[in-house]
A protein has these predicted regions:
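Bacterial N-terminal signal peptides
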Residues: 10-18
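Periplasmic peptidoglycan-binding/tethering modules of Gram-negative envelope proteins
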Residues: 36-39, 50, 59-62, 69-71, ...
Length: 239
């Protein structure tokens, strides 16, 4: 059953409030490296930096990181020698919004073999597309899950700091589900409604549903791979 936009947003708000009051926490997932030969739970020290992909020039930027604090996202100022102590058993979500660059979003585990990690930002251009893995939905529904709020806010900020940008919001679905195209489009529509309710001009947004046509993992073997197939992405349609 599909609920009206106001009900969806109310559910999202209630979920967020429950997180703020400490009754919910971000999910901590097991790192694949804990199953390797060199099993360790010792902290992993990594140096993070941000650079322009086209020039390799370092950029001082602010990241929104989930996982550093299990109760809430952390805003982290990153320069060329920002070193963090990471837990090898935890998944981290990273978001970066900078004017004139594509919105950056990824998930990582703290690989003990990686001592330095540089996030590469793509200069904005029409046609650029990126996935937003931290936008999640209640299982089996088209309703946004409260843990999506940091990614939704980053998408909102990306549109605001780039006033000439228009984007297509694209929903993707796993194979084997019923009405894949409708479900993927309705999930993209839920993101559209969130942005419009937050003040974004609807004329700068469009909605697409691609069903299971562009699965990242044709034969997923883990829950994470299946979740990656059920994703939201955005494409720059005007700049």
């Amino acid at each position: 059953m599909t609920f009206p936009p106001c009900i969806r947003l109310l559910g999202l708000l209630l979920g967020l409030l429950s997180c703020v009051h400490g009754t919910a926490q971000f999910v901590v997932e097991r790192s694949p490296w804990l199953d390797g030969e060199a099993v360790t739970e010792e902290p992993v020290h990594q140096t993070w930096a941000v650079a322009d992909q086209s020039t390799a020039q370092l950029i001082q930027a602010e990241l929104t990181v989930e996982g550093l604090n299990p109760r809430k996202p952390v805003r982290l100022s990153v320069d060329d020698d920002t070193t963090l102590k990471l837990a090898p058993y935890r998944r981290y979500s990273r978001l970066c919004v900078e004017p004139d660059f594509m919105l950056y979003a990824d998930y990582i585990y703290a690989d003990p073999e990686i001592q330095a990690d540089t996030l590469l930002l793509e200069p904005l251009a029409i046609g650029l597309e990126t996935a937003l893995p931290a936008i999640e939905f209640m299982p089996g529904t088209e309703d946004l899950y409260f843990t999506s709020v940091p990614a939704l806010e980053a998408l909102h900020a990306f549109i605001e700091v780039n006033p000439t940008v228009s984007v297509a919001i694209i929903g993707h679905e796993e194979e084997g589900t019923t009405e894949q195209h409708r479900t993927s489009r309705n999930r993209a529509r839920a993101v559209f409604e969130y942005l419009v309710s937050s003040g974004v001009n609807a004329n700068r947004l469009s909605v697409e549903g691609r069903g299971s046509a562009q699965r990242l993992y044709p034969q997923p073997t883990t829950p994470e791979e299946a979740e990656a197939n059920r994703r939201i992405s955005i494409r720059v349609t005007n700049y």
